Amino acid sequence: MAFRKETKIKSNFSKISIGLASPEEILENSSGEVLKPETINYRTYKPERDGLFCERIFGPVKDYECHCGKYKRIRYKGIVCDRCGVEVTEKKVRRERMGHIQLVVPVAHIWYFRSLPNKIGYLLGLPTKKLDAIVYYERYVVIQPGVKAEDGINKYDLLSEEEYLDILDTLPKENQYLEDTDPNKFIAKMGAEAIYDLLSTLDLDALSYELRHKASNDSSQQRKNEALKRLQVVESFRASRGRNKPEWMIVRIVPVIPPELRPLVPLDGGRFATSDLNDLYRRVIIRNNRLKRLIEIKAPEVILRNEKRMLQEAVDSLFDNSRKSSAVKTDANRPLKSLSDSLKGKQGRFRQNLLGKRVDYSARSVIVVGPELKMGECGIPKLMAAELYKPFIIRKLIERGIVKTVKSAKKIVDRKEPVIWDILEHVMKGHPVLLNRAPTLHRLGIQAFQPHMIEGKAIQLHPLACTAFNADFDGDQMAVHLPLSNDAILEAQMLMLQAHNILNPANGAPITVPAQDMVLGLYYITKLRKGAKGEGLTFYGPEEALIAYNEGKVDIHAIVNVVVKDLDKDGKIVDVMMKETSVGRVIVNEIVPAEVGYLNTIISKKSLRDIISDVIKAVGVARACEFLDGIKNLGYYMAFKGGLSFNLGDIIIPKEKEELVKRGNEEVEQIMMNYNMGFITDNERYNQVIDTWTHVNSDLSDILYKTIKNDDQGFNSVFMMLDSGARGSKEQIRQLSGMRGLMAKPQKAGAEGAQIIENPILSNFKEGLSVLEYFISTHGARKGLADTALKTADAGYLTRRLVDVSHDVIINEEDCGTLRGLVCTALKNNDEVIATLYERILGRVSVHDIVHPTTGKLIVAGGEEITEDIAQEIEDSPIESVEIRSVLTCESKKGVCAKCYGRNLASSRMVQKGEAVGVIAAQSIGEPGTQLTLRTFHAGGIAGNMAANASIVAKNNARLEFEELRTVDTVDEMGEAVKVVVGRLAEVRFIDVNTGIILSTHNVPYGSKLYAADGDIVEKGKLIAKWDPFNAVIITEATGKIEFESVVENVTYKVESDEATGLREIIIIESKDKTKVPSAHIVTEDGNLIRTYNLPVGGHVVVENGQAVKAGDIIVKIPRAVGKAGDITGGLPRVTELFEARNPSNPAVVSEIDGEITMGKIKRGNREIIVTSKTGEVKKYLVNLSKQILVQENDYVRAGTPLSDGAITPADILAIKGPTAVQEYIVNEVQDVYRLQGVKINDKHFEIIVRQMMRKVEIDEPGDTRFLEQQVVDKQEFMEENDRIWGKKVVVDSGDSQNLQPGQIVTARKLRDENSMLKRRDLKPVEVRDAIPATSTQILQGITRAALGTSSFMSAASFQETTKVLNEAAINGKVDRLEGMKENVICGHLIPAGTGQREFEKIIVGSKEEYDRILANRKNVLDYSEVE
């Protein structure tokens, strides 16, 4: 028995490597062999000797006490008992010491032949089926054909029992007695033993050479891919030279994990609870021992083979029970948990124990509001504090000499004697606590507070801290943690104190914004009322105004004039006569710092956020906190003074409601009449009805809003709550006193988009709903609650993936020195600005110098931060776009650099080295994800679609410019002549008549009617174009007669007739017969073809066969999907889809080149579209005929233009327009989803995630590098490898050289030396060629793929697919350098960010004297050297 070495791992390691375990290593780490399946003796409850819990192998069960009891107590430490062989030591060694089981026959490791990719199979070139047949003793495999090679038997051939016996019969007699090494001997075996022989005889270098040759020269793509797959496995073994041998994938010795990690616990009633692993180990041992016996008694081969197979299966179950088809089950039919299962999943070792540990010194309780707390304080119940600070109190008790021993001090604390409260007060000063509310969605979910002792049992929380925690006081609970060490206390105070975290890291806006009551109070006090008492008085200063108010001479809302301090235009504080203000506003301004000026506005939640922002900028965080406490107190006080509750009478129903509803009903009747007469289709009727009610509803809302706003000069309580932003939304008020409106229809699960019920709910909540109305609306309410529950999980999972992909992005250097950047412009949608240039460049770093275009003044130098003032200056200048540094173009090798990241939004200063920007980005994106999903049910399933806007109207006086416009002339319903647009790419630009600046650009849809011409100068409000919002149309461009082709009833079209109207409609359906393609030809009178139009699936044909049509007539209407109620339920999956870089379900076909369109033939239900560029390059695309084709013959398209309807896939954008375009696309698309919900998140967070998605490249041509074709490698690694071979030479012919072989890569210098030596001896010199670098293509990975592809295997394994990741890592002999957060948390190290940065580890802080002494010495040395 090989004895183990003492291996104590130091905790200051800097990397972890993983590899296959060799049998020698397993023995080295083992403390002895487990020979018996027994666990413990049923009578004595002591472990059996040589069993699974044996004390001799694993160590004693009790501290310092051997099995037989001969040696007890610590003084015998280290002695091995002579009677029972147990070493006397502490019992915790039973958590560390391993044992082993020596198997009689080798078995294959299930990870390497059962999981895909099949490693052993790839190495040997055997398919999984055949490999299974060998491993499970069903077939023999030929290991060495020997003399049988002539009979056509080759290595790796599989033989059945009969074939094997036949061969043995025909073998020459002496063949069996030859040595195994003799090449003539025939050898065939079965089981893992055979695999072992095959693997150990592999020549990896030769195999690698052969496969490389195959991969580069094979004509068949399939064989080429096969070769590349095998090559990857071969290369992994070659790369981890010596550390991994292929034959180690076959297990000869099974390690047994320490007994404490698979415990056996006695329950009451004489039964035991045991870990599943013990069962699995027991089966292995029993089968192994039985096999030993069978071999000893020379049992027949059949029996042995069966037993060997059972042993293989037992070991399989032990390693990975979930992978087997017939998993081992318990009596209760539950599969046993194997070693792999204990690592996997949420309950596995990684996520349960290594990444989520429980913490001592913690408490939890319900929270209540603490309105009199200051910022950064919280109230902790007395009893809780005494328990939390116990060790500190004990220490103080002993220090003060009140007690002598710790034990008696404990008693005093437990009895809560009065003396401890005084000590507790003292101990708590300057010792903050951390408060945490679950779910902790972002870093503000844990903050530090200075505790105050309070009576009661609930924790008091500062009301302004609620937003960050997303807490309310309806029974939420919070956990308290106590930082113990001095470092921890310091970090809590400096970095985590609530008063220091008043900005939201997601967008830089203040997060400590008063809400609800406070806002209402401030709004009320700053509101003006005409005709109030004391109106028009003038006061010489705030004091006088307050005296007048207190004496009751002037009302708090009265409009008065006061002399106050305000800022002049240079920003100096001066006295100003403020007209039109009120006493309330004076009171508020007493709290506002003078540096901000005088606020003479009404305060709502929105304006309050800006005010707080300004205060922080003007006077810094410390004084901003005082200001916040001031307005908190004032707000609460005024909400109470104003008595701002509302009653039923405050909910006003506008008189106009009846009129509007009547109008709506009349319009709907008219629509029904049109339908019954057959003027419109059922679909159009439905759309128009929905449209009518949507309009009625929005008109009613406007009137209602005006009514309530004018009630009591706007002092209506309901209106004040709404207008101040304290509570409620326009939607809710509309439902209370307008009408509930349209509701969504109950939908089957998985159906796309909600339909809308066309009968609206005309009542509101004040009038009360009828039974039917109530029933309709319950659906929405319930759906909301169900969605919430389901979506929370999705949002949480999104956050987890985001963190996993970006946790290693840390600011690692000041400046990476890149010259690249992103061009940033204001984001516009048509002509409304979504994000201004100011917002997008603020806090970023400029790439180049920015100079004012007219004055030539330098605004900001390259490499400098764009501050608020600079951004404003750029915004005001005519500059349209700015090139800024971005993490997308950062060239740091690890993490990103400070200049590319820009400003840290949580502190408004440039980001510091060591900031964990990746995790912050992930939290900023994930946190609102949960919020968004929780926001569905408030509208109660109300159909939230706006009335379709289907026209272009001039918003200013401007000149029109059309581009790519193709039209035909026709007449509209009124018989007026109009032009109809028939080009797909038409755009109209509105140009300012005076300056020539483009005001806005609009896309003019196909089928629009034009009411203006190119170059017209139009007035504001003029209609330019309008189109049918409900139907996409196909319009004929030629005049002639219709001729249908392949339009066959019930094959390519179906007829829908309407019972109500008796109207028949032809609707094109998808045909089973792909040769039949429905189309409409336009022919002349004499039958010559002019144009052909395809009829897309789902189109309603509105012309008859043989009908005469003129240019501009509609042939087909394709109903647009309308009435889809938008919900973030669509939003969250969209975000996931973008971050996972998934292709949409119906992708558009996109042109890859600029060129002209020609329509080709129809092939198998696809229409061929040919794009020919000006250079003569031709690309052909096949578009499914069920799709609508967006281009027409002779159109000129740009690269990236969609040819058919559908979404463009990110992969297409990357391939056609390049990486920058796809990065911008993903960032903007995700931003759109969040913007729709009114969530502001800074672009840089999305950029970090997208950067992580674009880390990898795929090798196209490996050249002379070590890469393989199609291999996916890190961009950084790729560049380094190319740099490595740059300028080197590859030997083509080694000539007479002894040192160099063909194919070897050498430096030019080595080559020169070698050749000059050969020349001197008149020998043939070496011939070389230049080394060829690899080429690659940038790829876009989804966040899951990117997280699994990280360089750290520990991070990947703790994320998903644990076994697969570890499996790959082991074969590659990977080394984890512990650069990210997760790896370090798993190892129990400080994270390499913030105060845990690695360079801080080596810093030694000495005393001031020492420093002075060193300086003095240095000065002496310098002086001395000068003298010399």
From Swiss-Prot:
Mg(2+) binds at D472, D474, D476. Its cofactor is Mg(2+); Zn(2+). InterPro entries: DNA-dir_RpoC_beta_prime (IPR045867), DNA-dir_RpoC_beta_prime_bact (IPR012754), RNA_pol_asu (IPR000722), RNA_pol_N (IPR006592), RNA_pol_Rpb1_1 (IPR007080), RNA_pol_Rpb1_3 (IPR007066), RNA_pol_Rpb1_3_sf (IPR042102), RNA_pol_Rpb1_4 (IPR007083). Signal peptide: none annotated. Zn(2+) 2 binds at C816, C890, C897, C900. It comes from the Bacteria. One of its GO terms (molecular function) is zinc ion binding. Keywords: DNA-directed RNA polymerase, Magnesium, Metal-binding, Nucleotidyltransferase, Transcription, Transferase, Zinc. Belongs to the RNA polymerase beta' chain family. DNA-dependent RNA polymerase catalyzes the transcription of DNA into RNA using the four ribonucleoside triphosphates as substrates. The RNAP catalytic core consists of 2 alpha, 1 beta, 1 beta' and 1 omega subunit. When a sigma factor is associated with the core the holoenzyme is formed, which can initiate transcription. This is DNA-directed RNA polymerase subunit beta'. It comes from Phocaeicola vulgatus (strain ATCC 8482 / DSM 1447 / JCM 5826 / CCUG 4940 / NBRC 14291 / NCTC 11154). The gene is rpoC.
